[in-house]
From Swiss-Prot:
Function: Xylosylphosphotransferase that is specific for UDP-xylose as a donor and mannose as an acceptor to form a xylose-alpha-1-phosphate-6-mannose linkage. Functions in the O-glycosylation of proteins en route through the secretory pathway.
Cellular component terms per the entry's GO annotation: Golgi membrane
Enzyme kind, highest EC tier: transferase
Lumenal side stretches: 104-864
Organism whose genome encodes this protein: Cryptococcus neoformans var. grubii (Filobasidiella neoformans var. grubii)
Topology within the bilayer: Single-pass type I membrane protein
Name of the protein this chain belongs to: 3-O-alpha-D-mannopyranosyl-alpha-D-mannopyranose xylosylphosphotransferase
Subcellular location(s) per record: Golgi apparatus membrane
Underlying gene: XPT1
Low complexity: bias regions: 16-29, 42-52
Database matches in PANTHER family: N-ACETYLGLUCOSAMINE-1-PHOSPHOTRANSFERASE SUBUNITS ALPHA_BETA, PTHR24045
Cofactor: Mn(2+)
């Protein structure tokens, strides 16, 4: 029967069973609706009739058709039987890619990588848990059996970025010297870590070791430097009282000894023996301690006593070879060190359990106390000077051989040089001696902030400056002069040779990032100086005063970064060039100094320091208030790096006005670029101005700061939206897994450094990346910001009882004193002086820290 065309709304005539096929032809207005219905592969005449009798059904949307097709064709295959192989193959590929060798992706080139994805975080990762239960208190308060943390995973140190301001805030701050950013954009205020070195010279075990090594090294090191006067506990209390709620972690660096078996077995907590048996058996390839010859029949017996007979031979060997003994302050309760532990008195769980409704902010943000032994911080770099490629060779063997020469160490300078290797260290640190005390409330900004950088307290006497020469008669100096001279000699090989100011005897501000830079830049000298067990030894060129080196390194890296920003990143990129000073540069310099057509014969230019408002009264307070951060409370600021570089110190009687002007000799400073109008490499000009003729670089900085106006440093930077393409990967080079932050070469001398844009970006940008060079320079400068400041501080030598009384009366009578340094080199009345000191300490800081053994949960709590 021939088909009949359907034209609604008229009812179609009755049809035989086989006539319905014509109604589903493509020409039928019902075709799409019928064909799209689920499960209608053979519609019966009755269903077709009902469909045709019903109202008109609009065509289905494409998305519904897709869902229908997916449901019809894919759902039957989504079963455990089909999904399990897919999951197992995916897991296998992931394991191969992450643990054996990286697998290339066919889509890798379609996704453009971003540099931000390759930077490490500013936060140093927390250290691993030590073997055993490190939350337990020590069995004996004098010593602690512990399993050292492993060496940092290579390559180490990996340079991490400083905390940068957000891009829009960074631009405003560096270009204009102020910012519209508020608390939301700026983020939370920085918190600080604090570090102390401590040793108990009265400990017979430590004293016997020192005497033995003193005889081996044939030196005479006085024991009075190591006497314990109970200063540490009160130094820590003073910091807690001065900065409540603003401290992240306290770090104690402690001496340690090899594990003597079986004598030290009694220092191992019996409760951890079962776990140690399991761990020791696994390290020896055994599956269970019961398989060990001589192991106890029941693990339950292991917790009853710890004797040589109650542990397996494998565990005994494990303890002797891998465990060590830590010297500890007797007042320290190791079970109350970590506020994140629910059993800690200040943990929210413990607070709510005690029925307290409200917690004091100082307790809610109480710092963690971490300890590290000399063994755990004495390491050598396993990375090249760029901070990116791992050094090849027998690294572990080299480090172990070096440790044999360096440890045990009785030299505080050698130990201080390892502070940056502390596990879990923050970027901003206050480094204290145990005889440093904070007497007044302080803000974080009294020490460090992302806006102004680290606060340095220099001494400003001309004759107190440190000479740049290594003197043979100071190589074995028991004081610090030899270490200072050596440190300045290292700086003078890398930067201009000059006198550099000494710093006040107060807590020092260190940034972990700068410590790691110094560890790479001067790694040979620091590795050798760290093997000097005593200051009196005649090894190498002497000790290195690391804290002073880091302080002065910050000043020099800032100056270097300023000049690189102008000479290479700004002048070197004019007119589309990436590496040359040319006619465009000459025109820019003439415009900077206001040359006219008649000034071609000008050879010398007198530069005057312009007016600056960076440190005008009230400005800093407004900036911190706008950011939602606390303004400084106990510091007077003398100079900000946002105003260029510190003026040189003058001799007594010299006119201070001479630091407000300078002369630029164009022929001398710019050489053939100016005299013969030859094009030169921008990196060569950078070396000329920065190192060969440092007075030229200093005067150019003054000129550019003046040209920037009253605030900001805009004259240094390249124009906005200046982009430079980073070099592509060279033959055989591997794609970087992580990127170091913007930084300049870490070579030990300036002669061998390559300051070209291509070289700098080859290690601090992704291959082929389009780098916003203006933002890059601002991030570079952020690493080295600093303030020169002074606080009302006292430093006293406790010689006798009468002298001690006078000192304490004077301090108590002057509430302006904010920092106290107290040297206990007692010459007479030793017991009386010690009693006076402890009496004054307890009067000044009666509230005990929560980790002290006799901490009282009522008397020692914080109150509003």
């Amino acid at each position: 029967m021939p088909s009949t065309a359907l034209s609604p709304p008229s009812r179609p005539p009755a049809q035989s069973y086989d006539s319905y096929s014509s109604s589903l032809s493509p020409s039928s207005p019902r075709f799409h609706a019928a064909a799209g219905s689920h499960g209608r592969r053979s519609p019966s005449p009755s269903r077709l009739e009902s469909l045709l009798d019903g109202p008109h059904v609009p065509p289905r949307s494409p998305s519904r058709k897709i869902r229908s097709a997916l449901s019809r064709h894919i759902r039957p295959h989504i079963t455990p039987r089909t999904l399990t192989p897919v999951f197992l193959w995916t897991l296998a590929l992931w394991l191969i890619h992450h643990f054996l060798f990286p697998l290339s992706s066919p889509f890798a080139k379609l996704a453009k990588p971003k540099a931000e994805e390759h930077f490490l975080s500013t936060t140093f990762p927390p250290p691993a848990q030590r073997l055993g239960d490190d939350r337990l208190d020590s069995v004996d308060p004098r010593w602690r059996a512990y399993h050292p943390l492993p060496a940092p995973e290579p390559p180490f140190p990996r340079l991490r970025p400083t905390r940068f301001l957000p891009p829009q805030c960074l631009e405003q701050w560096f270009a204009e010297g102020e910012t519209l950013c508020g608390a939301k954009e700026m983020g939370e205020e920085e918190t600080l870590d604090a570090t102390w070195l401590w040793v108990n010279g009265s400990d017979h075990r430590w004293r016997d070791s020192m005497v033995e090594w003193r005889e081996k090294e044939n030196v005479n090191s006085p024991e009075r430097h190591y006497r314990e006067q109970n200063e540490l506990v009160h130094s820590m209390r003073s910091v807690l009282d001065a900065l409540p709620g603003h401290l992240r972690t306290f770090h104690l660096i402690l001496a340690d000894y090899p594990f003597n078996y079986p004598e030290d077995l009694e220092l191992v907590p019996s409760s951890i023996i079962p776990d140690l048996e399991v761990a020791a058996s696994k390290s020896k390839g055994r599956r269970h301690p019961r398989e060990l010859p001589g192991a106890p029949a029941s693990l339950a017996n292991l917790t009853e006593r710890v004797t040589p007979e109650s542990i397996s031979p494998t565990l005994a060997s494990h303890l002797q070879s891998e465990w060590r003994i830590l010297q500890t302050p007797t007042w320290l309760d190791f079970s109350r060190r970590d506020p994140s532990d629910p059993s800690h008195p200040f943990h929210p769980y413990s607070v709510s359990k005690a029925g307290e409704i409200r917690q004091h902010y100082a307790e809610a943000s109480y710092p963690t106390l971490r300890y590290a032994s000399h063994w755990e911080v004495f390491h050598i770099p396993s990375v090249d000077r760029d901070g990116r490629q791992e050094l090849m060779g027998e690294r572990e063997w080299r480090e172990n051989e070096w440790k044999k020469k360096a440890l045990p160490s009785f030299n505080s300078m050698a130990i201080e040089s390892r502070i940056g290797w502390l596990p879990g260290l923050a970027d901003a640190i206050i480094a204290l001696n145990d005889d440093f005390f904070l007497l007044r409330p302080h803000a974080v900004s009294d020490f460090h902030s992302p806006l102004y950088g680290s606060v340095i307290r220099f001494e400003h006497g001309y004759n107190q400056q440190v000479k740049p020469d290594v003197e043979k008669n100071h190589i074995n100096d028991p004081g610090e002069m030899g270490g200072l001279y050596h440190a300045n000699a290292l700086l003078s090989r890398r930067f201009p040779r000059r006198l550099r100011p000494y710093f006040a005897h107060v807590p020092k501000v260190i940034t972990r990032g700068l410590h790691h830079e110094a560890s790479l830049m001067f790694q040979e000298a620091l590795t050798e100086s760290s093997t000097r067990r005593f200051r009196e030894m005649k090894i190498g060129e002497g000790d290195v005063q690391m804290q002073w080196l880091l302080t002065s390194l910050r000043v020099e890296r800032w100056r270097e970064a300023l000049l690189w920003t102008w000479t290479v990143a700004n002048m070197g990129t004019l007119g589309g060039s990436q590496d040359h000073w040319d006619n465009d540069t000459r025109r820019a310099i003439k415009n900077l100094f206001g040359f006219t057509e008649n000034d071609d014969d000008v050879v010398k230019i007198e530069v005057h320091r312009g007016e600056r408002w960076t440190l005008e009264p009230g400005r800093m307070q407004r900036v911190f208030r706008q950011a939602g951060w606390e303004a400084p409370k106990a510091t007077e600021f003398l100079f900000s790096s946002m105003d260029g570089i510190m003026p040189p110190l003058l001799r007594s009687g010299e006119d201070p006005a001479q630091n407000d002007r300078c002369i630029i000799d164009l022929n001398r400073c710019f050489g053939l670029f100016w005299t013969r109008e030859e094009d030169v490499l921008s990196s060569d000009m950078m070396k000329r101005l920065t190192f060969q003729y440092p007075e030229c670089g200093d005067c150019m900085i003054m000129a550019l700061v003046t040209a920037s106006g009253t605030l900001g440093l805009n004259a240094f930077f390249p124009p906005k939206e200046t982009t430079i393409t980073a070099p592509e990967l060279g033959p055989g080079d591997a794609y970087p897994k992580f990127l170091p932050p913007p930084h300049l070469p870490l070579t030990p001398t300036w002669h061998e450094a390559d300051f070209s844009l291509a070289n700098i970006l080859s290690t601090t940008a992704l291959p082929g990346e389009q780098v916003d060079i203006r933002q890059y320079c601002m991030r570079l400068l952020s690493r080295y910001l600093y303030l020169d400041a002074k606080s009302v501080s006292h430093f006293h030598m406790m010689k006798s009882a009468e002298h001690a009384r006078r000192v304490f009366r004077m301090i108590q009578g002057d509430p302006k004193v904010s920092i106290l340094g107290m040297n206990d080199d007692i010459e007479s009345d030793y017991d009386e002086v010690r009693g006076l000191m402890n009496e004054w300490f307890e009067m000044r800081w009666p509230r005990k820290a929560v980790w002290e053994r006799d901490w009282d949960p009522v008397k020692d709590r914080y109150n509003d």
